[in-house]
Amino acid sequence: MRPCMIHGPGNKGNLNLLYNVVSKGIPWPLGAFENHRSFTSIQNLCTVIEGLLTQKVVSGIYHMADDEALSTNELIEVICEVLGKKANIWCIPKGVMNVMAKIGGWLHLPLNPNRMQKLVENYVVSNAKIKKVLGLQKMPVSAKEGLTYTILSFKKR
């Protein structure tokens, strides 16, 4: 099984970093980039693991993800919805942001071309194969529901 980014209560990593930026009201300057990323909620992962352990499944490579891929802008909107805040997404033109990243690379700043690429690239996987072998029409938890559950756990810290 090959899960993409797994999240849930106690999560540590890039989702926490984005949550901290958004919760402080810092604007997201990359709103012009409409990337999409797959996520895996811990609830859906547990459902799939239980299915793999209790059903006879042919060995193979199975990608694991929630049913929907979200853009970073949509993810920020989910975070803000949980926090009761208005999303602060700036749509600075892509060309301007690319130039800023190049300058950041020359000056050894945090925003450089490599980091920019990681922030705006797509990473979408299909969970159709794993759902088919387990007889699932859809995952039990939507991407938004799973992320809301995770973000609520950040709020409690």
Residue ranges and their predicted role:
Residues 4-11, 32-42, 66-68:
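Glycine-rich "substrate-gating" loop/helix at the edge of Rossmann-like oxidoreductase active sites
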Residues 7-17, 52-62, 68-71, 84-87:
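Glycine/proline-rich active-site loop of Rossmann-fold NAD(P)-dependent oxidoreductases
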Residues 19-30, 85, 110, 128:
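A short C-terminal helix-loop "cap" of Rossmann-like NAD(P)-dependent dehydrogenase/epimerase domains
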Residues 20-40, 48-52, 56, 63:
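A conserved pocket-lining segment of Rossmann-fold NAD(P)-dependent short-chain dehydrogenase/reductase
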Residues 45, 49, 64, 75, ...:
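Non-catalytic, hydrophobic alpha-helical segments
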Residues 81-124:
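Terminal hydrophobic/aromatic helix or amphipathic segment near a protein terminus
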Residues 129, 137, 141-157:
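Amphipathic terminal alpha-helices
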